[in-house]
Amino acid sequence: MYQVIKRDGHVAEFSLNRISSAIMKAFDATHIPYAPDVIDLLSLQVTADYADKIRDGRIDVETIQDSVEAVLQRAGYAEVAKAYILYRKNREKLRNMSSTILDYKKLVDDYLRVSDWRVKENSTVTYSVGGLILSNSGAITANYWLSEIYDEEIGNAHRNADLHIHDLSMLTGYCAGWSLKQLIQEGLGGVTGKITSAPAKHLATLCNQMVNFLGIMQNEWAGAQAFSSFDTYLAPFVRMDKLSYNEVKHCVESFVYGVNTPSRWGTQAPFSNITLDWTVPADLAGQPCIVGGKPMSFTYGDCQPEMDMINKAFIEVMIEGDANGRGFQYPIPTYSITKDFDWSETENNRLLFEMTAKYGTPYFSNYINSDMEPSDVRSMCCRLRLDLRELRKKSGGFFGSGESTGSVGVVTINLPRIAYLAKDEADFFARLDHMMDIAARSLKIKRTTIGRLMEEGLYPYTKRYLGSFDNHFSTIGLVGMNEAGLNANWLRKDLTHEETQDFAVRVLKHMRERLSDYQEQYGDLYNLEATPAESTSYRLAKHDKAQYPNIITAHEGGTPYYTNSSHLPVGYTEDVFAALDVQDKLQTLYTSGTVFHTFLGEKLPDWRAAAALVRKIAENYELPYYTLSPTYSVCADHGYLAGEQFTCPICGRKTEVYSRITGYYRPVQNWNDGKSQEYQDRKTYQVSGAAQPHAAAPAKEVKETAPVSGNADRYTLFVTATCPNCRAVKPLLQKAGVPYEEKDAAQYAEEAKALGLRQAPTLVAWGEEPTLYVGAAQIKAFLREYAQ
């Protein structure tokens, strides 16, 4: 006899009497007479209706109840079916009432005794009274989301582990990127009843404001907070005060220590990210610098020497680590690797790649072969939403976000379960569509909810500096593509096999197409993410093993977990290029956070080896983000130790072993059971003997600036109401005497769409053929030629 999976995940033996009893109650409610034989016949028809849905000797109670409704309808008992539906709704209300009651004693005891896996759900939250407070409030908030905000189907999908709704413990959005330029122009404050700081005039003041800003915003968001163009925007402050290198380093040091102070809820440091340009970006080079909230007489393009000082100081602080030699967890820096990147043996290059080799700190954005542009981190608010089916790519790094963008929430789909339950590939996609529909609806509900709460004043600083969530994505991710291949009865192979790789490509393309549908349906931005899944990969596998004992997880016979997103099994190969060849065709299909981690057993021999590997990956692959991730250890007395050493070889004391868990470094002792098992299973890549990449990426076309149209009859400037670059180019056009007509792209959407506009500002020169100057940089290039 088979078993029934209840809504709370518990399993009970099947009983035909329970079906018969429910049907009789529905008949009694309608006062329609019935014979016992009729009830028996209907009950048997119900079991026949769901028979083909039984998997591994189990079926969920919702499927049985759906069959009861269907059988009653087909048998002509429409009124009885209505009564049964009402019976289900009443039962739902009772469940919802009971689900809002928390066992406070168990909640606190489980945390204090570390008997609940959720105590280590997030490795950044240490066992502490702050962690206890977060655990208690998080349980209440999660209950509120699942019982009071989301409908039963969404709540059940999460509780039953069909999918995972992230950050239920917070009544906030997920992650956000902020405009550092806005903070420099406007200062910190502007919220009623709170202290306001004027725009910073000195680097030390700005560093303090950034620390405070990130700490404030972290309390209004669940995940990462990001600044873009960190080095570019800070450089003018060095120039204005003619600061020495030691003075610059002292300011940067105070910033780094400040953002690593556990000032956030849960005794955590703010999850902070910064992108560094390394060289002045073209779209900023000609803009006047802002210091003290006012434009200066010099431009960002004049400040490359000061940028070099900022970068040198930041890297030296990160390399030195804290007083015990421990690497700094934050901020997570992302560096842009462009075609023009200078690979020569400069001092800053040596420092950058020494930091990479020793601590694995930076992320690298691949602008050589990927379809991204460095200016993307600043242009999101300028993008025109004319084609609702166009999927945009989130900028700003794996965890970070570009200026004024981010994500309202993330939902991860449990792919191995779908594959395990599916009869064939067609059934797999039907089930995937259903789960994605639930995920998309939950994200729409969350967006609406937090949008209303922001208007009501729950997130005062977000309201002040952001204003709306219009440029924030609704994010859908996935976990366990590797195990989906193993559980799919038409494959039975993991991602190391070409058949499963081809299947993964079909799945990712199908999910992208589905996201375009949701953008049309809901009018919001959606993106596809390779979810970090720090705890999700463990939670979903743990649930699946309890409900479906024969399902295949990443570690059979031990602690179960699923492989992150569409990554290869962690113990597959030591050949980094063999892994890259497979991942390159998969990671380029995501439109949100995705990264290739080059896990290394210990630090590389020198900085040149790190630089060579970073360059080789960027020049030969198209994947957007990657890291070098060496394992290292820290002894309280003897500091940094290369590689995994659980005891100090000098004094024999217990050490902290650091590795990258999902995207950031934490001691492996703090990891949850699933990720700890993954760490044990993981093979590290051998680089010293690595040959050339197995597959070289084709060269990309270089985007050319539009030629100046000298015989234009007229000009039209397309703008948006919220675009800062639009406001910047208008006075430049007027000063140059360009006779232009201004049009709001939203009001003239059809005309803008016909011209193929994707970004504001865009200047159209009308001649025999319209010539487009897209973005502030191209418009400024046009003006230089126009003046001649």
Predicted regions mapped to residue ranges:
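Structural micro-motif
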Residues: M1, K753-V764
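Charged, amphipathic alpha-helical regulatory modules used
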Residues: M1-K106, S468
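Local sequence-structure signature of Cys/Sec-based thiol-disulfide redox active-site neighborhoods
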Residues: T705-A736
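Thiol-based oxidoreductase modules, predominantly thioredoxin-like and allied folds used
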Residues: V738-E750
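Non-catalytic, surface beta->alpha helical segment in thiol-disulfide oxidoreductase systems
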Residues: A765-Q788
